[in-house]
Each structure stands twice: as C-alpha cells, then as structure tokens.
Amino acid sequence: MIFENRPLDQLKPGDHAELKRLVTADDLLVFAVATGNHNPMHLPDTDGDGDGKPDGTAPGIFLAAMISAVLGNLLPGPGTLYHKQSVEFLGHARAGDELLATVQVLEIAATGLVRLKTEVLLLPGRKVILTGEAQVKAPQKSIRFDDADLPGLIVERHRHFKALIARAKTLPPMTTAVVAPDDTPALQGAMEAFRQGIITPILIGNAAAIRKTAESCGEDLGNVEIIDSTHPAEDAVRMAREGKAQAIMKGRLHSDALLRPMMDRDTGLRTARRMSHVFVIDVPGRAHPLLVSDAAINIAPDLAAKADITQNAIDLARAIGLELPHVGVLSAVETVSPAIPSSLDAALLSKMAERGQITGGLVDGPLGMDNALDLAAARIKGIHGRVAGHADVLIVPDLDAGNMVAKLLTHLGHAEAAGVVLGATVPVMLTSRADSAMERLASAAVAVIYTDWARRQR
C-alpha cells in the first residue's frame, strides 16, 4: 500500500483520519515477542488470572500503538515524529474484537508541533476504550511511502497439531506397546500421551532401566503396566498380533531393530500392502498439514511400492480431515523424461490413479517441489492441473529425497513433523530422539485418529 502524508502547511484544525483493525491471536503473540511483555493476561488461549477462563486481553500499549499507526501512516503521515502522548484506558479489547483508531487535529503551533485528539473505539457499538491527546512534529514536505517491501511475518503456532491432538482426545485411548522407553525423551513422550488421554501405554523393555529413567525425570509409573523383556521389539509385535496392543511406539532403539520383527513373513505384522512411513508436517503459514512419504522405510521403492506408499499417504490424509487429498508426485522435472526414472514413475502413478488403481485422492506428476506447492510457479511453467500449486501430499522419489525434504522443513522452515508407519496390522509411531514433545504427542494423535478412521471404513 502507498501512503501519502499531509505536510505541515496542508494541515488545519478539524482534519481527521481513522484506521480499522481486527485484533487477532497472532497480533497478541507478535506483540508479546516484540516487546518482551509475556504477561499471560495478554496471551491468547491462556488463563492469566487463574479464573479458569482464557484471557487474551490486548495490552493497553497495543491500543496506543494503533494511534501511532494512524499518525504515522495517515495524519500527518510518513515523516511524523511523536513529541508527546497522553492516554486514559476506559476499557479492554480481546482477540476477535474490531477496533477503530481515530485522530483529529486540534491545534497547530507556530513551532510546527501539532496537537491531536486521539481515540480507540470498540466496534460495532463505538464504545471508547482509549482516549487522550497526541503532540507530534509534522513533516515539512510531501512524502510518499510504499510498504510493499516490508517483510511479512509467520507465527510459529503449530495450530494443526493442536487441532489433531484435541480431536484425538475425544476418542478412546489406544493401548500402545512402547518399545524400550528407557531414556527421558521416549518415556516422557509416552507418558504425556497417557496424561492427555490419547494412549494407554504398556512399557516393554528393561524394567529396571525404565524405572530408573522414570525416577530421574520425575515420572510416576504407578498406574502403568511394565513388561520386563530382553527382546522388547519382538514382544511388542507379538502383543499386536494377539490383539493386546492397538499400536506400537518406538523408544530408545534403532528403527531397524523395531521394523525387522514387524516385517517377518511368519510372525510379523505384514498386510497385503507394503509398509511405508508418512510424515505429517505442521508448516507455519499453511492452511493444512503437509504429508510427505516415504522418508523413513523404503530406500529405493519401485513402482509397485510407490503405489502402496501413495495409497497409504492418501488414506492418512483422509483420516486427518482432507476430504479429497491432492497428491503431488515429485521429480526434478515437470515433464516425463526417459532419462529420469522418477518422472516415469510419477506419470505412471498418475495414470494408475486415473484408472482406479489408487483411490481416494487426486494424483498428478511429475511435479517439481516448487510447482507442487506454489500456484504461481506452476502457472509460470504452464502447469494447469488441479494438483499443481495445491498439493496436500508429496510423494518423493526415494528415501534420501524424502528425508531431506522433511528435515529441511523442520530445521529451516520452522515446521514440526509427526510420523507413523502404515501398511502393518497396527500403526507404528516411529519417533526420533530429536523429536519435540509436541511432535511425539502429535504422532500419537495421528495414530489414534487413523485407527478410528480405518475402523469406520471396514
């Protein structure tokens, strides 16, 4: 937007300007971070005064800053400097309120100082919640300013994970075999999911080590079943086969050690579909979670494996609430090239979906990462399909590519990633020691939601 000021020689008493603003939860978070005022009374979804209700009251200075915005943008506008401001707070605003900030010129001094009446009103009733006077030094010459180059802000709130966790808490807790939870991250992750009512954990492994870990990190295991085992992965798989566990959660052991007994043809958890891992990634600024597969199990999948990988990812996307998932099959190029095998696989997967061999989603490829996610990039390259620029699910060429995509998003894109293994008789939470508490909790939530969805599809 271009702002144009009114220099001193164009001002007269009675001149008026106003600015509307809807107070959002993100506004309160940004203001708290920018000012260092972390008073919980001013944070959304936080009970700051202990009355059991969230507050989210806008700080008084936030209201005063709206006056500053009118002065700096509109009247007198760019080039204005504050000299003095008096304020009286007559009410409060909260996230979701619409406000109107107004200024009116009262007096213009020979020194170039301008006195203005300032108010902030709560709409629609126009209740005055701030009143006062400002004195500013008005600019001497005309100035036009284009704010197009100001950077945008994205608040890292991970609202999608919070929504998934809230949804999972409405479902019955899922009995989960937790394999080797004898370090703090693994044990605390399982216990937090237990406290939230998402899982009922059965801790399998070295019982003495598990109890020692619990003691060191202050976890009370009084109501939790512990199975002392020298082969916890095998025992967890056996419990799942026998129906004693509805899910498996990885603790402090290598993924290979857990996956090996799961994939045993005679005693494992195989189904007709190949097992694959799906990351559910909460990327700040996106309207919904982004799914990436496979980044953890299938190293160099062939076409048949990719078909199962794609179907597993579509099923999970539908389970978490995407009614018709848009699936972008990634390659380095957007055109089919015999020299690039991933482009051939992408084209074939698209055709398989078209012929009903993959169901439940829209599948298109090959697509580059840019034109799968960015509509403008897709249009520039002349790609006009329904998936291009709108992908909810990314199917990667191989494990290397998928792992890099997921880790770039989490470590550079400020995203958080939950993940589950599908294609087994029960979902498996393949957590990492580097996962945050939110990521571990979200993985459990996704597993519970998927299990409930799959049950209802039968």
Task: Give names to the regions the model predicted.
Residues 1-80, 143:
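Hot-dog-fold acyl-thioester-processing enzymes
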Residues 2-13, 94-155:
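HotDog/MaoC-like acyl-thioester-processing domains
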Residues 7, 53, 83, 88-89, ...:
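Short, conserved secondary-structure segments in the cores of folded domains
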Residues 18-23, 88, 135-137:
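Generic structural detector for well-ordered beta-strands
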Residues 69, 89-91, 105-107, 122, ...:
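A residue-level detector for short acidic-glycine micro-motifs
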Residues 83-85, 99-101, 276:
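Short beta-strand or tight-loop elements
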Residues 90, 119-121, 330-332:
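Short loop/turn motifs enriched for small/polar and acidic residues
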Residues 154-202, 207-387, 392-458:
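Anion-binding alpha/beta catalytic cores of soluble intermediary-metabolism enzymes, centered on
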